Amino acid sequence: MKLDLKILDARMRDYLPAYATTGSAGLDLRACLDAPVTLQPGETTLVPTGLAIHLADPGYAALILPRSGLGHKHGIVLGNLVGLIDSDYQGQLMISTWNRGQTEFVLNPFERLAQLVIVPVVQAQFNIVDDFAESDRGDGGFGSTGRH
């Protein structure tokens, strides 16, 4: 798949999104910052990437996901948990960054902060019904299938 990428900050030419390994599903996104930013515990900020994408095809979307090491080691996750980039969005990719840890965290310019994953999308059309065909589960919700 070819993906249109617009470089909004010339410094990002040296830090284009890349797959870390041949098996990677996510492209690393970096913080496009002029200076380090300190996030206090509980603080959230929007971090620019200096990049924009345009998927164009409504059969695809992009997800911005946290990097596992930052969340596990430092408590740095996404403020919106998952960022959804629709196929027709053309603005700068921004990363909502939340320090849920107990200590301050310093985010340095061009540090890898999140990952971008391209996923297929199916746009559903509703079929209005009075009742559903019966299933084994029915309307059983939270915990209805047992604990073990």
UniProtKB/Swiss-Prot annotation:
EC number: 3.6.1.23
PANTHER family: DEOXYURIDINE 5'-TRIPHOSPHATE NUCLEOTIDOHYDROLASE
Reactions listed under catalytic activity: dUTP + H2O = dUMP + diphosphate + H(+)
Keywords: Hydrolase, Magnesium, Metal-binding, Nucleotide metabolism
Residues that, per the record, bind substrate: 67-69, 80, 84-86, 94
Pfam families per record: dUTPase
Record bears the keyword Metal-binding: yes
Similarity comment: family membership: Belongs to the dUTPase family.
Gene transcribed to yield this protein: dut
GO molecular function: dUTP diphosphatase activity; magnesium ion binding
Pathway: Pyrimidine metabolism; dUMP biosynthesis; dUMP from dCTP (dUTP route): step 2/2
Top-level division of the source organism's lineage: Bacteria
Cofactor(s) the record lists: Mg(2+)
Protein function: This enzyme is involved in nucleotide metabolism: it produces dUMP, the immediate precursor of thymidine nucleotides and it decreases the intracellular concentration of dUTP so that uracil cannot be incorporated into DNA.
Entries under HAMAP family matching the protein: dUTPase_bact
Enzyme class: hydrolase
GO annotation (BP), single: dUMP biosynthetic process
InterPro entries, sorted: dUTPase, dUTPase-like, dUTPase-like_sf, dUTPase_trimeric
Protein name: Deoxyuridine 5'-triphosphate nucleotidohydrolase
Entry-linked Gene3D superfamilies: 2.70.40.10
